[in-house]
Regions:
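Interdomain motor-coupling "hinge/lid" segment immediately C-terminal to the ATP-binding subdomain
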Residues: 1-95, 99
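Generic structural marker for isolated residues within well-ordered, non-membrane alpha-helices
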Residues: 6, 103, 185
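Amphipathic coiled-coil/heptad-repeat helices and related helical stalk/stem segments
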Residues: 33, 117, 235-238
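A generic structural signal for residues located within well-ordered alpha-helices
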Residues: 57, 61, 81-84, 119, ...
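A short acidic, leucine-rich amphipathic alpha-helix
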Residues: 104-108
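Short amphipathic alpha-helical interaction segments
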Residues: 111-126
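A cross-kingdom feature that marks ATP-driven nucleic-acid transaction machinery
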Residues: 122-238
Length: 238
């Protein structure tokens, strides 16, 4: 199952995606800013993590949860007996969260061939740890042949894998950007499951490296682009 969305945690029923395609951007009465935003992103959406009273205990739970999935669920679902490579491979995937998939390169970091790496990514996808998203293109066939992007689903789990914590973010926000993008992607993914409309999540990147983090497409082919920025303010170039 997917983690909780922020709207579920805060008990707000409105769906952001439905509203955006209807031309209405939802207003937030008390937007999360500064350390409050960082705290939400690092916490993620799993009820068990949210219930922990401290960041240290949330991180400990996240690591135990990941270990349990690898040791129990992966063995049962995928029939993979040699599990020793999976924790290292998952951490390698965490380092490339939000980037395009190159299975040969990813697998090579932990001694796996490209075919095995792709299979393991598929297993993690079944476990709702991450998701591969296609690139958006006007020609639908191009979506098949172009490289997918790898996104983790829960920002709290990603932060635990990367050892990103509040103290680091307060001093240096460099690595927080990828965790924030994961948070935004995860929220949009959850909203697609509760929306009235039918939506696809993709990303955009052209030959000039112009990119959009998330492209939402409805059944009519209409688009909404979403870009996540960790900076305190937006610039015209963004």
């Amino acid at each position: 199952l997917l983690p909780l969305a922020q709207s579920e945690i805060e008990t707000h029923a409105a769906n952001w995606i439905d509203s955006a395609f209807a031309g209405r951007i939802l207003k937030v009465d008390q937007p999360a800013l500064g350390n409050d935003l960082v705290e939400r992103v690092l916490r993620g959406g799993y009820p068990e993590a949210i219930a922990r009273p401290s960041a240290r205990r949330r991180i400990a739970w996240a690591r135990q949860y990941i270990d349990a999935i690898i040791q129990r669920d992966v063995r049962e679902v995928a029939g993979i007996e040699k599990l020793d490579q999976l924790p290292r491979f998952l951490r390698a995937l965490a380092q490339t969260a939000g980037q395009m998939c190159n299975y040969t390169q990813l697998g090579g970091q932990v001694g796996l061939d490209g075919k095995t790496a792709a299979r393991y990514v598929g297993v993690f996808e079944q476990m709702y740890l991450l998701k591969r998203i296609d690139v958006w293109a006007r020609n639908r066939l191009n979506r098949v042949v172009k490289t997918s992007k790898l996104q983790f689903i829960d920002s709290g789990l990603l932060a635990a894998l990367l050892d990103v914590n509040m103290e680091e973010v307060q001093q240096d926000r460099t690595r927080f950007g990828n965790v924030l993008e994961t948070f935004v992607f995860g929220e949009l993914l959850k909203h697609t499951t509760t929306a009235d409309g039918d939506y696809r999540l993709m990303y955009y990147r052209d030959a000039d490296t112009f990119a959009v983090d998330v492209v939402l497409e409805n059944a009519a082919g209409q688009l909404v682009g979403v870009e996540a920025k960790a900076a305190a303010s937006a610039r015209a170039g963004d």
